[in-house]
Swiss-Prot record:
The lineage of its organism: Eukaryota, Fungi, Dikarya, Ascomycota, Pezizomycotina. This is HECT-type ubiquitin ligase-interacting protein creD. One of its GO terms (molecular function) is protein-macromolecule adaptor activity. Transmembrane segments: none annotated. Residues 375-398, 439-492, 576-597 are annotated as: Disordered. Keywords: Ubl conjugation pathway.
Length: 597
């Protein structure tokens, strides 16, 4: 405020311009008094002097004042009495020029600017204006002191706004009241958020489902109620509180639904009424304050609803409900010195709502219960999973099946466990035309086989077979097949953990009591280490073994052979066999060998 607000007569003609300019129109605190950060207030005092003047000082004062006052109704005891209390809770003074006690100085003509700044604590009370005799205000007062003339004074108000943080739960939590009036009505009344920006509107969603045939819906009344709790001595908890409480109605909305045209199916379950009402808030603080609790002034708001129910027998029932709401001032909607919105157009209001909805980062209240990524099991999100096969599990994984030949089961530990694939591999393996291994080599390792006595012992009689009978064998690994394949292409088709693989191989009882399964994770020694050392391994475990049933040194005997796995990978052993017999004959002999196992 410039020259028109000077106190003084002709002396003002020497000061053509005198004003307080703020870098920001108002100070914004985000959060409550216990959590809000400090704010920086800055500006400058501008003075334009056309002629030299004599001055004592140039000062600027910032003062915070709180006042609580109420009038008791004349009809009550002590009617007409006025209770009030005013206090100065903040003071700050800047001295730009000071000639000293009882002294003056000449200020030459010219333009002057005096900058000022101060840090305001986040716990300072917010501005509360709009009531006639109750308020919390901040005011600047700039003065040019003169000795033989009236002082030149200019004043300017300062508004401090306390708004909600972007993470406040009031901005993200919907408020609703839902219940069932037995044999009467099921209802739900809700608002999108608890917090509402001053000067905007409140949307209320109704859902009414009659439970009584013939029940009608009458008038629906929605009210916004403002409550004031005033206390004279809030800073003195030990003193007897002198308080006064009053309420006023801010909005009163009455609505009647058209039952014939408004009836609809709700949630695909029942017939009812579903609609929304918009309650426009006043655009001035004199008719509606923001929610606050500071310096003995407490303001709260709530929505009250009354729904008339027209019973079939003619009497009228009334449904009542209440929802709390919180009204706060947005920095995006400017308020002038008369406590009115500067721009109350719908476009400005919508812009404030959009700015609130598009705050970044996202609202914490919407994600505080989210599961941490490290705790999420990816098996349900990544398809197929690491243990998933291309189709239905093969029969060999079923516990209803059993296998007598444990060595043949070991062959499928790291490869495709298809029974048909295993059968095809065994059929193509020609075991004829190779010299038999003597029993002395069996005794060298001294490890018992699947279905017979220890090496070196002979059993005559029922288990005799011709010298040309096929032998059961397995390939300990697919190294000979994948020698020329780059690393990674020979990865097992269906990877399983050691526990699952061990559990999935179920031998018959007779096989299980005679032998043990080689551990899945046992280390395989190389060929040179096995042939270079004489290893005597204790029965029944053999980390590296393959069992072959074949003809012994004499007719009518069973010989059992155990040897290192790399033995079977020798080219002379695998490729020096003849192929004179047909595939059908090999299949028959293979089946006979399986039966004897």
């Amino acid at each position: 405020m410039a020259l028109s607000f000077f106190s003084g007569g002709g002396s003002a003609s020497h000061a053509k311009y005198f004003d307080i300019r703020l870098d920001e129109d108002y100070i914004v605190f985000r959060g409550g008094e216990q959590e809000a950060a400090s704010a920086h207030l800055s500006g400058k005092l501008v003075l334009c002097v056309s002629e030299p003047i004599s001055i004592k000082h140039i000062r600027l004062h910032l003062t915070g004042i709180s006042r609580v006052c109420w009038h008791l109704p004349s009809s009550s005891a002590g009617g007409g009495r006025k209770n009030w209390r005013e206090r100065v809770f903040y003071e700050k003074t800047w001295k730009f020029r000071d000639a000293g006690k009882s002294k003056t100085e000449i200020l030459p003509a010219g333009n002057y600017e005096y900058p000022f700044d101060v840090i305001l604590e986040g716990s300072m009370p917010e501005s509360v204006e709009g009531l006639s005799d109750t308020y919390v205000t901040y005011r600047f007062k700039a003065e040019i002191g003169r000795k033989y003339a009236k002082d030149i004074v200019v004043r300017r108000p300062l508004r401090i706004i306390r708004t909600l943080e972007s993470s406040a739960l009031e901005l993200s939590h919907a408020m609703s009241v839902e219940n069932i009036w037995p044999n009467k009505i099921e209802y739900s009344i809700s608002t999108p958020t608890k917090a509402v920006i001053f000067g905007t509107s409140i949307r209320v969603d109704f859902k009414l489902i009659p439970l009584l045939k013939g029940l009608g819906i009458g008038q629906i009344i929605s009210q916004l109620i403002e409550t004031h709790d005033l206390t004279l001595n809030p800073e003195d908890p030990d003193a007897i509180r002198n308080t006064y409480k009053t309420t006023r109605t801010i909005i009163n909305d009455e609505h009647t639904i058209d039952e014939e045209n408004s009836l609809e199916i709700i949630d695909e379950a029942a017939e009812g009424f579903q609609f929304s009402r918009t309650l426009d808030l006043p655009k001035t603080l004199t008719r509606c304050l923001q929610d606050t609790d500071t310096r003995g002034i407490k303001v709260r708001h709530k929505l009250k609803f009354r729904v008339q129910l027209l019973n079939p027998d003619g009497h009228i029932s009334e449904l009542r409900a209440t929802l709390p709401v919180s009204i706060f001032i947005s920095p995006n909607l400017a308020i002038d010195d008369n406590n009115n919105l500067v721009d109350s157009s719908p476009q400005t209001t919508q812009r404030a709502l959009d700015d609130l909805a598009q705050q970044a980062p996202p609202l914490y209240g919407e994600h505080q219960f989210d599961q941490l990524y490290s705790e999420v099991d990816p098996s349900g999100y990544r398809t197929p999973g690491p243990g998933s096969g291309p189709g239905t599990p093969f029969g060999t994984l079923s516990r209803n099946l059993s296998a007598e030949n444990l060595a043949s089961m070991n062959a499928i530990t790291h490869t495709d466990i298809s029974a048909s694939a295993l059968h095809h591999r065994l059929v193509n393996l020609d075991l004829r035309g190779h010299g038999r291994v003597s029993a002395s080599e069996h005794d060298h390792l001294g490890v018992p086989s699947d279905n017979g006595p220890p090496s070196g012992s002979n059993t005559h009689g029922s288990n005799t077979h011709a010298p040309g009978s096929p032998e059961l064998s397995r390939r300990a690994s697919d190294e000979d097949v994948h020698d020329n394949i780059p690393s990674g292409m020979a990865t097992p088709f269906i990877p399983h953990s050691a526990e699952l693989e061990t559990l999935s191989r179920v031998p018959s009882y007779s096989t299980a009591v005679r032998s043990s399964v080689r551990p899945h994770d046992s280390d395989l020694p190389d060929y040179q280490a096995v042939v270079a050392e004489t290893v005597h391994m204790s029965a029944p475990q053999s980390p590296q073994q393959a069992h072959i049933r074949g003809s012994g040194t004499g007719r009518g005997s069973d010989s059992y052979f155990s040897a290192p796995m790399d033995f079977f990978h020798r080219p002379a052993f695998l490729h020096s066999r003849s192929h004179s017999h047909s595939d059908d004959e090999r299949r028959i002999r293979l089946t006979q060998a399986r039966g004897r196992a």
